[in-house]
Structures are given as C-alpha cells and as structure tokens.
C-alpha cells in the first residue's frame, strides 16, 4: 500500500485510489499513507514535499521537505513547465506530421516518415 507510481493516481493504505494531479481534487493522504519520499511531517493530510529524488529511508526523505508554501509553489511551477514543454513537443510533432502529409498529398512521389 502507498503511492501508485502512475502519474495520475495515488493508492491509499486501504486500497482506495484517487487522482493526484489536479489541484482542485488533490488527495489528502492520511498519516500512514506516505512513502519515504512523500511526507506529511505534521500529519495534516497535506503533501509538503518536492519530488526531486528517491530516498532510502524516512530520515533521508526529511531533507527534501520544504515549508508548505515553497513546496507547493515549486511543485506547481515545475509541473507547469513540464506540461508546457510536452505540449510544445506534441504540437511541433503534429504540425510537422500534418505538413508532411499535405506535401505528400500534393506530390504522390514524395515519401516521408509519416506516409510510409
């Protein structure tokens, strides 16, 4: 029991799963539902952690804990940057694929990686 390593779900100790990426529907973890890199030091049901690495023990993970506001802001900014980076990559790939298909439609002899 504990965290499910999928990016969008958290598994609570009782086996119940819930979303973990939406800010409005954030899952509040009970005190026993934390792993070594996901701490709730004051047992408030809040995730006050920056996910920067894997820790081997509770004591190693404590070094990752920041004050709630800083951790929340840092986590949100990092998540925002990652999402925007992936959105840009996907947008460029789709734009290139559409352009290549349009060019291939105009010239039947043209072969691209998108039309193979």
Swiss-Prot record:
Predominant place of localization: plastid
Molecular function terms from GO: oxygen evolving activity
SUPFAM superfamilies listed in its UniProt record: OMPA-like
Origin superkingdom: Eukaryota
InterPro entries xrefs: OMP/PagP_b-brl, PsbO
Cell compartments where the protein resides: Plastid, Chloroplast thylakoid membrane
Transmembrane segments: none
Keywords: Chloroplast, Manganese, Membrane, Photosynthesis, Photosystem II, Plastid, Thylakoid
GO (cellular component) term, any one: chloroplast thylakoid membrane
One GO process term, biological-process aspect: photosystem II assembly
Entry keyword annotation includes Phosphoprotein: no
Additional comment: On the 2D-gel the determined pI of this protein is: 5.7, its MW is: 35.1 kDa.
Family under the similarity heading: Belongs to the PsbO family.
Reported function: Stabilizes the manganese cluster which is the primary site of water splitting.
Protein name according to UniProt: Putative oxygen-evolving enhancer protein 1
Source species of the chain: Pinus strobus
Gene: PSBO
